UniProtKB/Swiss-Prot annotation:
Pathway: Porphyrin-containing compound metabolism; protoporphyrin-IX biosynthesis; 5-aminolevulinate from L-glutamyl-tRNA(Glu): step 2/2
Organism: Clostridium acetobutylicum (strain ATCC 824 / DSM 792 / JCM 1419 / IAM 19013 / LMG 5710 / NBRC 13948 / NRRL B-527 / VKM B-1787 / 2291 / W)
Subunit structure: Homodimer.
The gene coding this protein: hemL
Alphabetized Pfam families for the sequence: Aminotran_3
EC code(s) of this entry: 5.4.3.8
Catalytic activity: (S)-4-amino-5-oxopentanoate = 5-aminolevulinate
Record-linked InterPro entries: 4pyrrol_synth_GluAld_NH2Trfase, Aminotrans_3, Aminotrans_3_PPA_site, PyrdxlP-dep_Trfase, PyrdxlP-dep_Trfase_major, PyrdxlP-dep_Trfase_small
Cofactor: pyridoxal 5'-phosphate
GO biological process: one example: protoporphyrinogen IX biosynthetic process
Protein name listed in UniProt: Glutamate-1-semialdehyde 2,1-aminomutase
Modified residues (N6-(pyridoxal phosphate)lysine): K264
Matching CDD domains: OAT_like
Compartment(s) where it occurs, according to its Swiss-Prot or TrEMBL record: Cytoplasm
Phylogenetic placement of the source organism: Bacteria, Bacillati, Bacillota, Clostridia, Eubacteriales
GO CC field: cytoplasm
Length: 422
């Protein structure tokens, strides 16, 4: 079957033909390629066409596709069984590894997705503080939990949905919205709801309104405000954790959160998530404390093995991050040169190996409102051209591109050669 035939038949059985909205290419005039396999930095579709992968499964595949050490660990565990719904030594192995190699994670709880990690972290913060309100930032996406679907990024922004039908007003009445990189907007909320705010949750490197790194002074001030008001600071590092640095964005900024959420890379390509932080807070979780959270598949041994194999490679090879940053710098410089040559207004935002090309006339894109001013039609034209030419980029202006360990100088040069023909 061709890609088109598979996609058309998929629409009969899955809403939009996909299991996550952005995969449907709603903003593009092409159908999505149906991916069959991957190797290193390359993907292959059902028709045998090859692509250089700059999406990396939306972040997890930093080590490239079919990483042999991950596959070997997984195969070994599969011989023992798929899952038991019981404690295993593998979940201890991964939990201990994260707690001993990542700053500010004294205890950790495994879950099954980034959404589950963030919603659980917020529940824990509310239980610990005995307060209800949270502050999130316009354009930040923390998963599809009801309380987060207010001015959210990712597919919500791509499809220009203000929220989501099915979310009762009561689910979001305790969600307060501030502007990313704007301290004053946060101070206003703390002044108004001084003793009611349980937590501030933020992506320190936003990746779901396009890549927008936080300003360091902004995060420093958030830390001060949370400390002064006895609120919990939650870093959503589902995307940036183990990616922009092994210890995550918190290590780049030198700002200490109370709780951190993880997913994507920590599962080695398998469904996984986790949240961790100070013992004092984490001990409020059941069975030690009153805050209840559970999961049948949490701590699955196959996933734990894949996660451990992935994180160990990243931790033991810090030069990987230097290499990815070097490639990112080359790609960024090349894109800006093309922009200058062709007279195409754009802004490149990058944090190490996360990047977005904003087709935007502004000098800087630092917030949700800045990102929304981008030319989405121009981005669609760019994405269609790149994808049909074998460069697999996100189909949305508001999603991140990723570089990984297996990308090469030749991959970067090919990207730039194709973009020059836009």
């Amino acid at each position: 079957m061709t890609n088109k035939e598979i996609f058309e038949e998929s629409k009969e059985y899955m809403p939009g033909g996909v299991n996550s909205p952005v995969r449907a290419y709603m903003d593009l005039n092409i159908d999505p390629p149906i991916i069959k396999s991957g190797k290193d930095s390359h993907l292959f579709d059902e028709e045998g066409k090859e692509y250089i992968d700059f999406i990396e499964a939306w972040g997890p595949m930093i080590l490239g596709h079919k990483n042999q050490k991950v596959l070997n660990e997984v195969k070994e565990v599969l011989d023992e069984g798929v899952g038991f719904g019981a404690p295993t030594s593998l979940e201890l192995k991964l939990a201990k590894y994260i707690c001993t190699t990542v700053d500010n994670v004294e205890m950790i709880r495994m879950v099954n997705s980034g959404t589950e990690a963030t919603m659980s972290a917020v529940k824990l913060a509310r239980g610990y503080t005995k307060r209800d309100k949270i502050i999130k930032f316009a354009g930040c996406y923390h998963g599809h939990f009801d309380g987060f679907l207010v001015e959210a990024g990712s597919g919500v922004l791509t499809q220009n949905i203000p929220g989501s039908p099915g979310v009762p007003k009561g689910s979001i009445e305790n969600t307060l919205i501030a502007e990313y990189n704007n301290v004053e907007s946060v101070e206003v909320l703390f002044n108004k709801y001084k003793d009611e705010i349980a937590a501030v949750i933020i992506e320190p490197v936003a990746g779901n309104m396009g890549v927008i790194p936080a300003k360091k002074e902004f995060l420093v001030k958030l830390r001060e405000l949370c400390t002064e008001n006895q609120s919990i600071l939650i870093f959503d590092e589902v995307m940036s954790g183990f990616r922009v640095a092994y210890k995550g964005a918190q290590s780049l900024y030198g700002v200490t959160p109370d709780l951190i959420t993880f997913a994507k890379i920590m599962g080695g390509g398998f469904p996984c998530g986790a949240y961790g932080g100070k013992k004092e807070i984490m001990k409020q979780l059941s069975p030690l404390g009153p805050v209840y959270q559970a999961g049948t598949m949490s701590g699955n041994p196959v996933v734990m093995a894949a996660g451990y194999a992935s994180l160990r490679q990243l931790h033991e090879n810090p030069e990987y991050y230097t290499y990815m940053d070097k490639l990112g710098s080359k790609l960024e410089a090349g894109i800006l040169e093309i922009s200058k040559e062709k007279g195409i207004p754009l802004v490149v935002n990058r944090c190490v190996n996360m990047m977005t090309i904003f087709f935007n006339k502004a000098k800087e894109v630092k917030s949700y409102s800045d990102a929304k001013a981008s030319d989405t039609k121009m981005f669609a034209r760019f994405a269609e051209h790149m994808i049909t030419s074998g460069i697999y980029v996100p189909p949305s202006q508001f999603e991140a591109m990723f570089l990984g360990v297996k990308h090469t100088e030749e991959d970067i040069e090919r990207f730039l050669d194709v973009m020059k023909k836009l």
